[in-house]
Amino acid sequence: MGIARILSAVLFLSVLFVVTFPTLLSADHHDGRIDTCRLPSDRGRCKASFERWYFNGTTCTKFVYGGYGGNDNRFPTEKACMKRCVKA
């Protein structure tokens, strides 16, 4: 009875993996990584004032980052934002 349960669990996990794996490769991923350029701008949770750049869907735009939190759609320079997010 123990072997049957183990085999059932392995089969279940295998089917689960096969069913969910294509979702991991969906439109929110680019070149195998999450496409940060599609994330909204996020100032973060603190009150510092750091000049950063985010991609707004069309171009890179300056915003004030609070210094902590936020998301990965945040770049130190316009050039870094353009390099990552603007498709040539």
Swiss-Prot record:
Its main location: secreted. Expressed by the venom gland. Residues 1-27 form the signal peptide. Gene3D superfamilies: Pancreatic trypsin inhibitor Kunitz domain. One of its GO terms (biological process) is envenomation resulting in negative regulation of voltage-gated potassium channel activity in another organism. It is found in: Secreted. Disulfide bonds join 37-85, 60-81. GO terms for cellular component: extracellular region. Residues 28-33 form a propeptide. Transmembrane segments: none annotated. It comes from the Eukaryota. Residues 37-85 form the BPTI/Kunitz inhibitor domain. Pfam families: Kunitz_BPTI. Belongs to the venom Kunitz-type family. 01 (intermediate) subfamily. This is Kunitz-type U15-theraphotoxin-Hhn1p.
